[in-house]
Amino acid sequence: MTDCRLYLITPPALDDLAAFGHDLAAALDGGDVAALQIRLKDAPDDIIAAAVQVLSPIARARDVAVILNDRPDLAARLGCDGVHLGQDDMPLAQARKLMGPGAMIGVTCHDSRHLAMEAAEAGADYVAFGAFFPTTTKDAPTTADPEILSIWQETMEIPSVAIGGITADNAAGLAAAGADFLAVSAGVWKHPQGPAAGVAAINAAIAQGLEARLAARGG
C-alpha cells in the first residue's frame, strides 16, 4: 500500500454511551477514518453489546468498518466487520471459523516481525506493531522502532497498523516510515479542540508523512 489511514479506537471506558455516540459522529465527520475499534477491556458482555449496537450504525453510516477488540464470539454474534486479537486471545484459526471468511481479523504483534509473519501465514488481514510512544490507554509490554514498519512495508503485502501513544505531533513519522494505518485513541478523544479537530489533525499529519514517504522513494 502507498496510503495510510486513521484507525480509531474508543476510549477504554464509555460512561455515557449516548454522549459518546455524539462525540463519535463528530469525530468521524472531522475527516477520513478507515475503521473504529470498540475496545472495552474486561467489560461485561451486555455493556459491549450495547456499545456495538449504538456505535455501529454511526460508523457504518460513514463507511467506517467496525472492529471489536478481543472477542470473536461477540463480534460474530453482533455482526461486527472484524475482530482484533491479542497474542493471548483466541487463536486466529478459531476466530476465523467464528467470524467467517469475509471478516477482517487483525493481530497484535508487539515489536516482533516473527509474530507478524506467523499471523500473516495464519491468515490475518493486518498486523499491529507497537507501542511506538508512551501510552496511558493500555499497558504496553514492548516498544517498537519505526524501522519495523519500513521493513514490513518493503517485504510484505499484508497491511501494518502502528499503535501506541500516537498523536498529531508524532503521526507523520510513522506514516513516512511505512505504516498503512495509525491506531489512535487519546490523540483524538483528548485533543484540546475536540475529537473532530483531533481527526483532522491526525489526517493532516498523515498527509505530511505520506509526502515524505514518496519523496524518500524518489516520487
From Swiss-Prot:
Paste the cofactor note: Binds 1 Mg(2+) ion per subunit.
GO molecular function (one)? thiamine-phosphate diphosphorylase activity
Pathway(s) where this gene product acts: Cofactor biosynthesis; thiamine diphosphate biosynthesis; thiamine phosphate from 4-amino-2-methyl-5-diphosphomethylpyrimidine and 4-methyl-5-(2-phosphoethyl)-thiazole: step 1/1
Q: EC number(s) in its UniProt entry? A: 2.5.1.3
Q: Which GO terms describe its cellular component?
A: cytoplasm
Which SUPFAM superfamilies does this UniProt record tie to the protein? Thiamin phosphate synthase
* Protein name, as recorded: Thiamine-phosphate synthase
| Cofactor(s) it depends on | Mg(2+)
- First-level EC class: transferase
Q: Which HAMAP family match?
A: TMP_synthase
Q: What is the lineage of its organism?
A: Bacteria, Pseudomonadati, Pseudomonadota, Alphaproteobacteria, Caulobacterales
